Amino acid sequence: MKIYSKLAALAISAFVMVSCAQAQQTETRKPGHFTKVHSGGSWEVILTEGNTEEIRIEAKGVDLDKVKTEIDGDVLKLGLVNGNYRNVSLKFYVTYTDLEGLRCSGSGEMHVESDVIAEDFYIGLSGSGDVYMKNLRADELDASISGSAKIKIQSGSVGEAEISQSGSGDFVAEDLSIEELEVSKSGSGDTFVGDLGEISVRSSGSGDVVYSGSPRMGDIKVSGSSSIRKR
């Protein structure tokens, strides 16, 4: 009977440990000041503007002490401590006071739910992750996509924009007006933008550039089956 009792106790303890590991854990952190956010992994990041910098973490399948929220210069880095992880569900709710750039590597998603106003804004994607923005107003935009990642901007206006694409990733911003646009692309990724003042394109592969308005045509060099056309 004692053996059975010990086995039962061990089974209960193991069940409790597994249940705790699978339960959702929540923590709020004050990381310090940052203006850019880098997410590297398969999780979701939701960003909103506020009066103070703050991160709320929702984690399932991983201990919170394995979740990294580090400041490197003016960059907030989100991720996990090096290790082997399975069945991890992780979500970051980031509150910022000033936002100047986003970087996403891996298969995660970043959602900016507030309007963003900036002098210079940078978006860099590699892998299959996506960035979604509600509204962007900036003097200059530098956007880089590699792999199958996608950038989607619902609306806004930009003075000068440089968009670099390699692979099958798309840049989708049909209601984003741009005074001067320069596109450099290879592969099958498409570029959709709004009203343009001037456009320059260097494209190889099958990716298209689709725009609105009647822009001045700058330096246009196209090879492959790519097309540049008005919507």
Residue ranges and their predicted role:
Residues 1-231:
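Intrinsically disordered, low-complexity terminal regions
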